[in-house]
Amino acid sequence: MAPPLSPGSRVLIALIRVYQRLISPLLGPHCRFTPTCSSYGIEALRRFGVIKGSWLTVKRVLKCHPLHPGGDDPVPPGPFNTREH
């Protein structure tokens, strides 16, 4: 089970949601990655919190340019993702 979201994570997720609903439809689909950079950002903030989640999101957005091939780039597993072997 993931920890509850911090106020900072909630604010950043709300800002990403505003982007997804108001700005992204005007720009059209152009993200080179799966999941999209905004979806990646939300998942990273939920999984890692505001500091590491923001860092991962910034790194991802900086990779989203025409010279990068894109493709599948999921959020890394978080500290609360456990697997039984």
Curated annotation (Swiss-Prot):
It is a peripheral membrane protein. This is Putative membrane protein insertion efficiency factor. Belongs to the UPF0161 family. Keywords: Cell inner membrane, Cell membrane, Membrane. The keyword Cell membrane applies. It is found in: Cell inner membrane. HAMAP family: UPF0161_YidD (MF_00386). SMART domains: Haemolytic. Could be involved in insertion of integral membrane proteins into the membrane. It holds the Pfam family YidD. GO terms for cellular component: plasma membrane.
